[in-house]
Curated annotation (Swiss-Prot):
A Pfam family recorded for this sequence: LpxK
Protein's job: Transfers the gamma-phosphate of ATP to the 4'-position of a tetraacyldisaccharide 1-phosphate intermediate (termed DS-1-P) to form tetraacyldisaccharide 1,4'-bis-phosphate (lipid IVA).
Gene name, Swiss-Prot/TrEMBL: lpxK
GO molecular function, one term: ATP binding
Name of the top EC class for this enzyme: transferase
Organism: Shigella boydii serotype 4 (strain Sb227)
Name used for this protein in its record: Tetraacyldisaccharide 4'-kinase
Length: 328
């Protein structure tokens, strides 16, 4: 229902307009206060890059963060990552992730980013505290990438990158809750780069698509072409589950059943195993896999995806960030 409201298919969005105007008024006032320096943002001693979005829901932001961190690491840059840690329940904040940190403590995306990149990752509702925690333990870090947080103006930033879902784009264009917008589309004029996940990019936007890798068994780490798996049940607890199901079909997999879950939904063995029989093969997203490794069965697999950016702009962006991190 919420997708139909936000896309404009359902007329119910009109009933929510008063709340949307209030949301827009408050969020605009907050940004204006920081712009006019009525409120002061904290500036880190190293450059900060924000990877965020203008809309609620999944846009492919986390794969972009992983791509950015890995690309900078390949250029010899030491990167730290901070996140709010949505859904996390740590005993105290900031929390610096370790190999033993669970998704319940830190949230799904921070654990995924930590496991994929081996970069220092810290979570805190106050992102400046997360930055301080990383720099205290890793003083050699040269640049901070913040996963989400475009609207978290308490943290000063040097570069802003926005990720857009190229198919859904901005829906009906209204602020939450009548539409999907955290900020209006005009905000794109002030950011440094716009990355479009799928769809048809517009002038000045960087095209991106998610490239699936080999399926990985949660228990053994065995890898294989996902099309070799039989009697597949697909499960996705991400912002937009249909994107994952479409990716599987693109890989030649016709799932016997698709199980969409809420983004950041907590998972346990009983709930997951109820979705798949012993004769079937469960294929989930990597984001779900980080929550299921501790209790995985032998017929559970996940399909990792990597962000692939096209054109000349990604190289220019990386050159800019490398120079920034190097102090040039």
């Amino acid at each position: 229902m919420i997708e139909k409201i936000w896309s404009g298919e359902s007329p119910l969005w009109r009933l929510l307009l008063p709340l949307s105007w209030l949301y827009g008024l408050v969020s605009g006032a907050i940004r204006l206060c920081y712009k006019l320096k009525l409120k002061r943002a904290w500036r880190a001693p190293v450059p900060v890059v924000v990877v965020g979005n203008l809309t609620a829901g999944g846009n492919g932001k986390t794969p972009v963060v992983v791509w950015l961190v890995e690309q900078l690491q390949q250029r010899g840059i030491r990167v730290g990552v901070v996140s709010r840690g949505y859904g996390s329940k740590a005993e105290s904040y900031p929390l610096l992730l370790s190999a033993d940190t669970t998704t319940a403590q830190a949230g799904d995306e921070p654990v995924l980013i930590y496991q994929r990149t081996d970069a220092p990752v810290a979570v805190s509702p106050v992102r400046s505290d997360a930055v301080k925690a990383i720099l205290a333990q890793h003083p050699d870090v040269q640049i901070i990438v913040t996963d989400d947080g475009l609207q978290h103006y308490r943290l000063a930033r040097d570069v802003e990158i926005v990720v857009i879902d190229g198919v859904r784009r901005f829906g009906n264009g209204w602020w939450l809750p009548a539409g999907p917008m955290r900020e209006r589309a005009g905000r794109l004029k002030s950011v440094d780069a716009v990355i479009v996940n799928g769809g048809v990019p517009r002038s000045g936007e960087i095209p991106m698509h998610l490239l699936p890798g080999q399926a990985v068994n949660l228990r053994t780490g065995t890898r294989c072409d996902v099309a070799q798996l039989e009697h597949v049940v697909a499960m996705a607890g991400i912002g937009h589950p249909p994107r994952f199901f479409a990716t599987l079909k693109m890989c030649g997999v016709q799932p016997e059943k698709c199980v969409p879950l809420a983004d950041h939904q907590s998972l346990n063995h009983a709930d997951v195993s109820a979705s798949v029989s012993a004769e079937q093969t469960l294929v989930m997203t990597e984001k779900d896999a980080v929550k299921c490794r501790a209790f995985a069965e032998e017929n559970w697999w996940y399909l990792p995806v990597d962000a692939q950016l096209s054109g000349d702009e990604p190289a220019k962006l990386l050159t800019q960030l490398t120079s920034l991190a190097s102090g040039n």
